[in-house]
Amino acid sequence: MDSVSVNQIL
């Protein structure tokens, strides 16, 4: 999972 995906989820 990339950092962009992580930020979208949070």
Curated annotation (Swiss-Prot):
GO biological process, one term: methylation
Role summary: Displays RNA-directed RNA polymerase, mRNA guanylyl transferase, mRNA (guanine-N(7)-)-methyltransferase and poly(A) synthetase activities. The viral mRNA guanylyl transferase displays a different biochemical reaction than the cellular enzyme. The template is composed of the viral RNA tightly encapsidated by the nucleoprotein (N). Functions either as transcriptase or as replicase. The transcriptase synthesizes subsequently the subgenomic RNAs, assuring their capping and polyadenylation by a stuttering mechanism.
Quaternary structure (record): Interacts with the P protein.
Source domain of life: Viruses
Compartments, as annotated in UniProt: Virion; Host cytoplasm
GO cellular component: host cell cytoplasm; virion component
Lineage: Viruses, Riboviria, Orthornavirae, Negarnaviricota, Haploviricotina
Molecular function GO labels: ATP binding; GTPase activity; methyltransferase activity; RNA-directed RNA polymerase activity
Keywords: ATP-binding, Host cytoplasm, Hydrolase, Methyltransferase, mRNA capping, mRNA processing, Multifunctional enzyme, Nucleotide-binding, Nucleotidyltransferase, RNA-directed RNA polymerase, S-adenosyl-L-methionine, Transferase, Viral RNA replication, Virion
UniProt catalytic activity: RNA(n) + a ribonucleoside 5'-triphosphate = RNA(n+1) + diphosphate; a 5'-end (5'-triphosphoguanosine)-adenylyl-adenylyl-cytidylyl-adenosine in mRNA + 2 S-adenosyl-L-methionine = a 5'-end (N(7)-methyl 5'-triphosphoguanosine)-(2'-O-methyladenylyl)-adenylyl-cytidylyl-adenosine in mRNA + 2 S-adenosyl-L-homocysteine + H(+); a 5'-end (5'-triphosphoguanosine)-adenylyl-adenylyl-cytidylyl-adenosine in mRNA + S-adenosyl-L-methionine = a 5'-end (5'-triphosphoguanosine)-(2'-O-methyladenylyl)-adenylyl-cytidylyl-adenosine in mRNA + S-adenosyl-L-homocysteine + H(+); GTP + H2O = GDP + phosphate + H(+)
Protein's UniProt keywords contain Transmembrane: no
EC numbers, comma separated: 2.7.7.48, 3.6.1.-, 2.7.7.88, 2.1.1.375
Family: Belongs to the paramyxovirus L protein family.
Protein name: RNA-directed RNA polymerase L
